Amino acid sequence: GLKKAKGNIQTSPEYKDLTNRAQRALNNNYETHPTPYKAANLMGQDANQLYTAYRATGEQRYADKMLACTRALLASTPDPKLINDFYCGDVLFLLTHTYDACYDRLNQEELQKIEDLTFQIAKYHHNVQRKGRVENHIFDNHYWQRAYREMLQIGLMFADKNDTAKEILEYCYELWTARAPASGFNRDGEWHNGQGYFHSNVKTLWYVPSLMSYVTGTDFLQHPFYKNLGKALVYA
């Protein structure tokens, strides 16, 4: 697990790249931007590197940076146009992962502000879900690449204390079992809009089934799509 990994992480061939990426994020000063929300997507992208480094190494400086960025957002006026899927995904990643990594360092007011802002941003995407568009549309690339993953994480994080999160979690689970991976009826491992675009979807494709397998005890990677994926990529 993570505790064991922290003791051996420096021997990993990926350690240098991991810490270099995190260092570049540390060197940025987006939290000092006069209008923090104009740099919020960049903060979120940095948070991806910082959170990974924090969990892998346990070094507090990475969490400190995430916390500074989050507090900058909490102290400013939210962007009323928070609906773009990738922009929202970056902001939600920063908020939820700071909430996770720094929970004990946030006061009750800050925790509540993060929760409120998270659901304020997620509301638009959840309304899209509730209208039935995603399960009936052939395939919304941006939703599956990013918004779905963030919504699933929100559902898991807050389902025990928030009815909307519980609804989101239930929806995401049912949607995955009905329409994923790769639209739900793809069994041959081919990526429907071309293997050259596969890389944009790969994080959702490995993260979600791995997470659901862990939570449910059922191996979601046994789906025929995954069984045939390697061969499909080779012959694409």
What are these regions (language model features)?
Residues 1-12:
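N-terminal module-boundary/linker segments of secreted carbohydrate-active enzymes
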Residues 15, 19, 23, 27-236:
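Aromatic-lined, polymer-binding surfaces characteristic
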